[in-house]
């Protein structure tokens, strides 16, 4: 059986809300058709990294490890799946959040595999999902306040809020599980590499 979020009533209610409250649910497609431009040189990558990760890197004062990390970050930001996903977002807010979380998550990990990068893309997609779900909940709460006395509408809005709360919790759980998997696997790999290096020495 279909859940409420897939039901005809839910779809009809969404259409009703879109017609009755256009200013509340409207989202401007302010990035539609614009292609994301990844950084290709160190200075541009450093500027973005400093902005989103609260760093103060200076290209003239980079140590070898930091330079290696930032050079690798440039390749991460040119990865095909990252580009595909970021270009699928039609609002600048979603693109900026996705890019920021991706940079924060990956910039200091120059040894990530392709599979791990794809998982970080998934994590960052869920960060965007969380933001969108939270915005939907806020809008539904506003409409709930405006619909006082309209029993049928308030009942449906209550069901929609419950659905959004469940989506939010599922999203949080997915992020936690993926990060635990990523951090655990990388920690093992780094430990094994250190062990191999020690045995060579």
How would you name each of these model-derived features?
Residues 1-201:
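Intrinsically disordered, low-complexity, charged/polar segments
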């Amino acid at each position: 059986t279909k859940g409420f979020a897939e039901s005809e009533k839910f779809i009809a209610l969404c259409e009703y809300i879109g017609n009755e409250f256009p200013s509340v649910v409207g989202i401007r497609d302010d990035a539609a058709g614009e292609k994301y431009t990844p950084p290709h040189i160190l200075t541009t990558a450093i500027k973005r990294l400093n902005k989103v990760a609260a760093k103060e890197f200076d290209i003239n004062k980079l140590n070898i490890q930091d330079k290696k990390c930032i050079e690798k970050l440039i390749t991460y930001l040119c990865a095909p799946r990252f580009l595909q996903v970021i270009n699928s977002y039609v609002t600048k807010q979603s693109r900026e959040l996705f890019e920021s979380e991706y940079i924060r998550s990956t910039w200091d990990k120059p040894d990530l595999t392709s599979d791990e990068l794809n998982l970080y893309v998934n994590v960052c997609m869920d960060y965007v999902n969380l933001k969108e779900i939270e915005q939907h909940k806020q809008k539904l709460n506003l409409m709930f306040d405006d619909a006082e006395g309209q029993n049928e509408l308030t009942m449906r809005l209550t069901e929609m809020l419950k659905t959004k709360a469940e989506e939010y919790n599922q999203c949080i759980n997915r992020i936690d599980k993926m990060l635990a998997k990523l951090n655990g696997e990388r920690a093992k790999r780094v430990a094994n590499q250190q062990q191999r290096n020690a045995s060579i020495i």
